From Swiss-Prot:
Cofactor dependency: Mg(2+); Zn(2+)
Protein's cellular compartments: Cytoplasm
Keyword Metal-binding: yes
Gene: hisI
Cofactor note: Binds 1 Mg(2+) ion per subunit. Binds 1 zinc ion per subunit.
Enzyme class at the top of the EC tree: hydrolase
Protein name according to UniProt: Phosphoribosyl-AMP cyclohydrolase
Entry binding sites for Mg(2+): D71, D73, D75
Organism encoding this protein: Bacillus cereus (strain ZK / E33L)
EC number(s) per entry: 3.5.4.19
UniProt keyword terms in alphabetical order: Amino-acid biosynthesis, Cytoplasm, Histidine biosynthesis, Hydrolase, Magnesium, Metal-binding, Zinc
Catalytic activity: 1-(5-phospho-beta-D-ribosyl)-5'-AMP + H2O = 1-(5-phospho-beta-D-ribosyl)-5-[(5-phospho-beta-D-ribosylamino)methylideneamino]imidazole-4-carboxamide
Residues that hold Zn(2+) according to the record: C72, C88, C95
Subunit details: Homodimer.
Gene Ontology, cellular component aspect: cytoplasm
Length: 101
């Protein structure tokens, strides 16, 4: 089973393997998805820069991919990782650190 990239980018929810905590949300195109499969490290597509980026390439806070899941419509991806260091560029463990309710 493969993701359906016919409509473009797919959301990729990244979660920590042990805790299942949501670390971040990013987007993948088909090339980022294939590079993620090949390298077992996360690759995403930057909508603002319009280019691929490898999580942790600059910071060293890499994500080692343990498994990938597709939703029932094959248009969203869950990436289960072992995170090295914080996931958020702000230095927080997760990008979802602002509690609303």
């Amino acid at each position: 089973m493969k993701p359906n990239f016919s409509k473009g980018l797919l959301p990729a929810v990244v979660i920590e393997e042990g805790t299942k905590e949501v670390l971040m949300l990013a987007y993948m195109n088909e090339e980022a998805y294939e590079k993620t499969l090949k390298t077992k490290r996360t690759w995403f597509y930057s909508r603002s820069r319009r280019s691929l980026w490898n999580k942790g390439e600059t910071s060293g806070h890499v994500q080692h991919v343990q498994s990938l899941y597709l939703d029932c419509d094959q248009d969203a991806i869950v990436v289960v990782v072992k995170q090295v260091g914080p996931a958020c560029h702000t230095g927080e463990k997760t990008c979802f650190h602002y509690k609303i309710i």
